[in-house]
């Protein structure tokens, strides 16, 4: 028996079947570093249009988690796809470095008794160390960026830039000092930004408290009565007993109806709608004597239950009837609505009672409760109310309450003198900041679109922005205040520039060690140098000013603007929000043209990641077990507009999909052995019809993928690439060409046509997967035939694909119909194989009984139809001749009959043919194979 294996063009490639990503990816990273890939991209991008994705800086604290990985991978996929689309797309990673979490870490490690200077020194060192760790982890994900020169908010230049940004906002007239209730954390000893507030369930004591009437005649008149026959009181309901000592007013809704209720020993004022529920709660019965609108109660005085002072009734639209009594007790120091209402009625700052100190302890001078921590004072306050006969009811409820994101402890609103950026303050010129910001939102594209309404609602309803903090590790607010008037120095903007120059050289320490006389001269004794620092959201929120202008100036006529900001959905109240406000205050537009929001990671059951649940997926572990490309493929395959489920099982499914794509790439490479595109590439017009279709199909898909990449629809990109590999290539084209590829002459037109198509497909595919499978694409790039540069990323989308000419006989619709026929044949073949009627496709003879139109289509392939169907024989007969045992198919006008071939099997091509053994020199092979070995070789026209 002759061994004909040597006469076949068997596939061969060094591209490994087993990816070994955990070992191979670090080697690829080293190669990128050694060739200076990022620098090369900047060099070739000099004359390209620029695309700027501005990095929202992660906090320089701790190792990265799966959310960080998701965020950075999404950004990297965009940067890579934009680069392949012909843009210069730099990526400058950033880090947020100041703020309480780092200061807290330093205090835990080194103690709280450090001096301010030492604290700042240790914070800077800690942040530097954390950045290095995170940087290594981000690079390991395959993120391509300028990691050698990242931006850090603690860089001296950026600290100075932040001061200059603040100076611009001061110059615009947006900054003011005011007493306002702000989110306050006792553990932080500082105000908190809205984005630093989390809501958790908390148990609180609720109390119904009676405030006795002081103006009896006015109350009687309000209810249309000549006098009050009994003692009367108005009843409030609150979940914060600790605020009762600071009560200064009582709020009713002007349009609600209030009732005067006789309960036997006294009269109570309650919202009419809530009378029944209140009396039930108090365990009493009563009769409504009269009703009056809330507006009739305005300015009637009641008495504080245990202090000798009055509490007037003020009208307020925020009073609700959902719970309580319809009357709100007002402590203006501890509630924003209370504060606003009391100010509206003329209360001045000096009259606002604020007995709670920054640590949560009442001032020592507070009668009854001085020196007590507010949460612990609640029972004492309840006891006092009981003692004076003012407590009508108390119970404990569990409700959602604001907590510090860092300490997980309850917060309060607390009125403090702080610096604010005013939302509705009239600026030096132009619209207010709220108006500017709302307009800017309308001019911004949102992905997904619902983000626009969300951010709009937040801006429309937000209070003034408290930008001052009482901490050490932060960029200073370099203001000098006149000791007598409390006003800013008239040369504040000029002085801020002088401070910025010093900070640029020495860092924020320059301000804290500055002697005021150095800048103010003889004026120094008249001014206080303040010690407040800026909210960290101002740090990151001004990076468009002090980073974009430096790293990649856009040349925008009114200031820098990035093409894209991309972060998690929590950043609508965080970085997107603060950046919008500062951008509109300085440049009167958003610092971004487009906002992309991704959801949070959850497990397969939709639960949040939690160590206690054991469902945490650590990116470091994924890198070490599956490889970063598997994680990248998971990111690409998931619709990021909602929650993104991830688990070991989900990642394993991504690994399975990866293997299918890799195996397709390996098949392409292995069949390009011996192919030199410089000499063997055929022009489109010389290629076989099926090969031309394959290249045309690749071109059409590339256009779709470019559109999906441009719209950041990575899950569509993944789905289409995966389906192309598995169905159109693996299930159709690659299956068909094996016979031609292996059995025809090595340099025959039939084989070179096929290899030309495979080469074009490979050149396109390697680019398509490059934004997602960053490592695998670059590995694949090294194995493709022909001269090429060092990395797939140094190229653009493949331009060698050709479209089928219009009117081409075997065009797109034709091959779609043939594909349907092939699917029908395969389906019936599986049934016959399962029944053991045939062993394999090449043992089968198929007869296709087709109606006229389909018969004409099938006839166009002539005797090459069998190669398309991968059967030894394929015969077409009229539909009406179909015997009773012919099988109907899902293809209209087609029935099939499959039988086992009676002819011998060719030892070379494995087809069962009647001419096997006809040539005495080759008794084991068919005539076609003899011709391919010893003759001129078979000629193919179609497939």
Swiss-Prot record:
**What does the record give as cofactor?**
Zn(2+)
Q: Motif 'KMSKS' region located where?
A: 608-612
SUPFAM superfamilies given for it? Anticodon-binding domain of a subclass of class I aminoacyl-tRNA synthetases, Nucleotidylyl transferase, ValRS/IleRS/LeuRS editing domain
User: Any note on cofactor binding?
Assistant: Binds 1 zinc ion per subunit.
Gene Ontology biological process terms in this record: isoleucyl-tRNA aminoacylation
**Keyword Electron transport applies:** no
Q: Which Gene3D superfamilies match?
A: 1.10.730.20, HUPs, Valyl/Leucyl/Isoleucyl-tRNA synthetase, editing domain
Q: Which domain of life is it from?
A: Bacteria
Q: What's a single GO MF annotation on this record? A: isoleucine-tRNA ligase activity
Residues given in the record as Zn(2+) binding sites: 906, 909, 926, 929
Q: Which reaction does it catalyse?
A: tRNA(Ile) + L-isoleucine + ATP = L-isoleucyl-tRNA(Ile) + AMP + diphosphate
Give the family this protein belongs to, as stated in its UniProt record. Belongs to the class-I aminoacyl-tRNA synthetase family. IleS type 1 subfamily.
Subunit: Monomer.
What does the protein in this record do? Catalyzes the attachment of isoleucine to tRNA(Ile). As IleRS can inadvertently accommodate and process structurally similar amino acids such as valine, to avoid such errors it has two additional distinct tRNA(Ile)-dependent editing activities. One activity is designated as 'pretransfer' editing and involves the hydrolysis of activated Val-AMP. The other activity is designated 'posttransfer' editing and involves deacylation of mischarged Val-tRNA(Ile).
Report the protein name in the record: Isoleucine--tRNA ligase
- Organism, by scientific name, is Pseudomonas fluorescens (strain Pf0-1)
Give the source lineage, highest ranks first. Answer: Bacteria, Pseudomonadati, Pseudomonadota, Gammaproteobacteria, Pseudomonadales
């Amino acid at each position: 028996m002759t061994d004909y294996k040597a006469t076949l063009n068997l596939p061969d490639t060094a591209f490994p079947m087993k990816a070994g990503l955990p070992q191979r990816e670090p080697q690829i990273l080293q190669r990128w570093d050694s060739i200076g890939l990022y620098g090369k991209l900047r060099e070739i991008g000099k004359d390209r249009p620029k695309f700027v994705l501005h990095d929202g800086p992660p906090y320089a604290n701790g190792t990265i988690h799966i959310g960080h990985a998701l965020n950075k991978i999404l950004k990297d996929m965009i940067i890579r796809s934009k680069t392949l689309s012909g843009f210069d797309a730099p990526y400058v990673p950033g880090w947020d470095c100041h703020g309480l979490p780092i200061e807290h870490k330093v205090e835990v490690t080194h103690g709280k008794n450090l001096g301010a200077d030492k604290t700042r020194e240790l914070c800077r060192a800690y942040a530097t160390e954390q950045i290095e760790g995170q940087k290594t982890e981000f690079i390991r994900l395959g993120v391509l960026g300028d990691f050698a020169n990242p931006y850090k908010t603690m860089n001296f230049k950026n600290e100075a830039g932040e001061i200059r940004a603040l100076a611009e906002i001061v110059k615009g007239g947006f900054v003011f000092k005011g007493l306002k209730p702000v989110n306050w954390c006792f553990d932080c000893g500082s105000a908190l930004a809205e984005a630093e507030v989390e809501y958790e369930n908390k148990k609180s004591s609720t109390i119904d408290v009676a405030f006795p009437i002081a103006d009896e005649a006015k109350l009687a008149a309000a209810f249309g009565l000549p006098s009050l026959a009994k003692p009367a009181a108005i009843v409030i309901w609150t979940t914060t007993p600790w605020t009762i000592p600071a009560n200064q007013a009582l709020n009713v809704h002007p349009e609600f109806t209030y009732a005067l209720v006789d309960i036997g020993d006294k009269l109570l004022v309650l919202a009419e709608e809530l009378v029944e529920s209140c009396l039930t709660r108090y365990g009493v019965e009563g009769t409504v004597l009269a009703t009056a609108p809330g507006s009739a109660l305005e300015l009637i005085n009641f008495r504080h239950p245990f202090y000798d002072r009055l509490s007037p009734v003020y009208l307020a639209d925020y009073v609700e009837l959902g719970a309580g009594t319809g009357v709100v007790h007002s402590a203006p120091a501890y509630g924003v609505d209370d504060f606003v209402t009391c100010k509206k009625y003329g209360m001045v700052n000096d009259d606002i009672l604020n007995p709670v100190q920054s640590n949560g302890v009442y001032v020592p001078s507070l009668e009854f409760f001085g020196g007590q921590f507010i949460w612990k004072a609640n029972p004492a306050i309840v006891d006092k109310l009981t003692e004076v006969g003012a407590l009508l009811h108390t119970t404990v409820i569990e409700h959602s309450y604001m907590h510090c994101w860092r300490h997980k402890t309850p917060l309060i609103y607390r009125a403090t003198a702080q610096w604010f950026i005013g939302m509705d303050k009239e600026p030096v010129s132009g619209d207010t900041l709220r108006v500017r910001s709302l307009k800017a939102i309308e001019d911004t594209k949102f992905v997904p679109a619902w983000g626009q309404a969300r951010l709009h609602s937040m801006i429309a309803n937000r209070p003034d922005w408290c930008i001052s903090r009482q901490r050490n590790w932060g960029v200073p607010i370099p203001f000098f205040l006149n000791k007598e008037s409390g006003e800013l120095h008239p040369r504040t903007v000029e002085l801020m520039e002088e401070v910025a120059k010093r900070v640029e050289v020495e860092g924020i320490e320059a301000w804290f060690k500055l002697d005021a006389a150095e800048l103010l001269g003889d004026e120094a004794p008249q001014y206080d140098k303040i010690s407040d620092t800026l909210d960290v959201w101002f740090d990151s929120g001004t990076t468009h000013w002090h980073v974009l202008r430096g790293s990649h100036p856009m040349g925008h006529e009114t200031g820098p603007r990035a093409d894209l900001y991309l972060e998690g959905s929590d950043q609508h109240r965080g970085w997107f929000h603060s950046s919008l406000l500062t951008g509109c205050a300085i440049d009167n537009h958003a610092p971004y043209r487009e906002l992309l929001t991704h959801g949070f990671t959850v497990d397969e059951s939709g639960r949040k990641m939690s160590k206690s649940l054991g469902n945490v997926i650590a990116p470091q572990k994924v890198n070490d077990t599956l490889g970063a490309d598997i994680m990248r493929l998971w990111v690409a395959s998931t619709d990021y507009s909602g929650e993104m489920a991830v688990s070991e099982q989900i990642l394993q499914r991504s690994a399975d999909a990866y293997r299918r794509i890799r195996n397709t790439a390996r098949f392409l490479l292995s069949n390009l052995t011996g192919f030199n595109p410089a000499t063997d590439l055929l022009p489109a017009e010389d290629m076989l019809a099926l090969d031309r279709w394959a290249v045309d199909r690749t071109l059409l898909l590339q256009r779709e993928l470019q559109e999906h990449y441009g719209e950041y629809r990575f899950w569509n990109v993944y789905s289409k690439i995966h389906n192309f590999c598995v169905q159109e290539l693996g299930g159709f084209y690659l299956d068909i060409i094996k016979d031609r590829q292996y059995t025809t002459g090595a340099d025959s037109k039939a084989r070179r046509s096929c290899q030309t198509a495979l080469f074009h497909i490979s050149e396109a595919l390697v680019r398509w997967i490059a934004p997602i499978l960053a490592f695998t694409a670059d590995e694949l790039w090294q194995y493709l035939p022909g001269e090429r540069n060092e990395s797939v990323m140094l190229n653009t989308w493949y331009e060698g694909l050709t479209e089928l000419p219009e009117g081409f006989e075997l065009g797109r619709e034709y091959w779609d119909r043939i594909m349907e026929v092939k699917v029908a044949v395969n389906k019936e073949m599986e049934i016959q194989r399962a029944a053991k009627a045939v062993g394999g496709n090449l043992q089968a003879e198929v007869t296709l009984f087709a109606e006229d139109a389909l018969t004409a289509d099938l006839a166009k392939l002539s005797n090459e139809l069998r190669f398309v169907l991968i059967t030894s024989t394929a015969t077409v007969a009229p539909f009406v001749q179909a015997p009773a045992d012919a099988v109907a198919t899902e293809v209209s006008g087609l029935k099939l009959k499959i039988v086992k071939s009676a002819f011998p099997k060719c030892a070379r091509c494995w087809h069962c043919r009647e001419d096997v053994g006809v040539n005495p020199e080759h008794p084991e092979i068919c005539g076609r194979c003899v011709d391919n070995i010893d003759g001129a070789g078979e000629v193919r026209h179609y497939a």
